């Protein structure tokens, strides 16, 4: 009996799973079958085909780029080269991502916010100015009622903010919540409001003159005075300014319209990495008023050449009817864990003043109400429960001991002794950080400033010093 030979077509199909020698015309007719028998990432090995055969391609590379040769028509595949397809694919991806990434370029992050121009007027500032974000003012009276010591006037803070809003651009028509929205505060405006607390009085008054002259309107001076009263009321009610303000970024560009401004700032990374859009000043260095800049290493004769940290520091004086707030940018080689001891040495007088006078004007507890721990009475009485050293860890014996619950009203606490608070802003990574002291012209007013070059923003959290 004669046997029929096996069909050869399945063998041809099986070979196509290993060898990729099928021409364009044959491949076009069996595209679905080809996807089943040969995965897209299979390599195509073998000699280069001649004639009307398609050029060999590396399927793994095409798969990584997201290109499937079977999805394109034979005419397109014959006219376009693999390299051209790959370049087009890369360019399309880069265009969707927003641009090509240059290897080794510094990474930075931009942030943007629309704010009122009452406390931050970008047209009067320059690129590189420091900006702070302020918590919504409606939260402050509630915080005052929870944090103010007994006897303090909590309504003082609400009245101060109400008077500030009356002098603002939207004072005649407040928001539906009864207060303006949260916004930004320029560091220069904050320094001008605290001008009376700085030792360099002439430089601080120059900053105040710049704000009152260039912020526009006749109510700029009134806003400064009322904002200064708000800061004093915050210290009085223990709603410290550092608890309602945070670092926003270094000013880069802005767009203003009427009493609103859209502000763009660098919140992380090098300040000078982005373009400002101004031909005269394409890059922005950090600019700080000279009265609010402290070189801590030079003040305390510490350290030598090397990289330095930048800190934002608030200082407070808690004395009845003499509350003061001050803000600084401190440069030091000390890390955050070692800065508190240096600030204690620099602002030691404030620390002593707050420890002595911070508890004034507070309602004391009633007399003879658990003022002192009755150790002598308990020791003399044989009826008082006792516990040996071996029974301290046993709740059965510890719970029987006398419980002393003193009334701490009128006594010094950590908040009454708080004299400063600091947060890390960033670093100056150069071995010899450049701090240029000069006088900059803001309109018709000359202001002594310090220009910090090479600042890399790296903001951190707040730490209170008491």
Curated annotation (Swiss-Prot):
It holds the Pfam family Herpes_VP19C. Residues 1-29 are annotated as: Disordered. The keyword NADP does not apply. The keyword Hydrolase does not apply. InterPro entries: Herpes_1. GO terms for molecular function: DNA binding. Keywords: Capsid protein, Host nucleus, Virion. GO terms for biological process: viral capsid assembly. It is found in: Virion; Host nucleus. GO terms for cellular component: host cell nucleus; viral capsid. It comes from the Viruses. Belongs to the herpesviridae TRX1 protein family. Interacts with TRX2, MCP and capsid vertex component 2/CVC2. Structural component of the T=16 icosahedral capsid. The capsid is composed of pentamers and hexamers of major capsid protein/MCP, which are linked together by heterotrimers called triplexes. These triplexes are formed by a single molecule of triplex protein 1/TRX1 and two copies of triplex protein 2/TRX2. Additionally, TRX1 is required for efficient transport of TRX2 to the nucleus, which is the site of capsid assembly. This is Triplex capsid protein 1. It comes from Human herpesvirus 2 (strain G) (HHV-2).
